[in-house]
Amino acid sequence: CAITEVGAARFRGGECLGTLQTMVDPGCGIPSSITVLTGITESMVAGAPSIREVLPSLEEFIGDAVLVGHNVRFDLSFLREAARLAGRAPLTNRSVDTCALARRLLHDELPNCRLGTIARHLRLDHQPRHRALDDVLATADLLHLLIERAGALGASGLDDLLGLPSMAGHP
């Protein structure tokens, strides 16, 4: 159907500078499969702002920061479509996909690259629950761990990760 929740966090040097979280009224019924996966019900989004109303505050919160996500292109495709429908410019921020990075750095340790599998295996502080902010915080934990692991490839921070072959991305 459409976006039902937005979550974001800003980090600098591993420190969380702030978070943004809101339910979003998708303007249509929520399929039962989404409710089973996320726990989000129609009553939870009743009265919530539309994505059209949320986009300006999300864009302001994000600014020109690098966007990090697990399968980030999937999430960005929803935001890009929402921006198009709202008559807004799409996000043009650089992006890093922790799924692609995990495949490269953890490929021999894990049966798959699902965020939940990785979070359990690595005992991340935050566990993903298919809820926006939980997944954001788990992804941030994963990124920080992967930055440490990427040191063997000569990367010492996010800017270096963007320069690694097959790690750089643009929405």
Q: Where are the model-predicted features located?
A:
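Conserved beta-strand -> loop -> alpha-helix junction used to position metal-binding or nucleic-acid-contacting
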Residues: 89-103
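A charged, well-structured terminal subsegment
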Residues: 126-145
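Acidic two-metal-ion nuclease catalytic site recognized across multiple nuclease folds
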Residues: 121, 140-171
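Short Asp/Glu-rich motifs
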Residues: 54, 102, 138-139
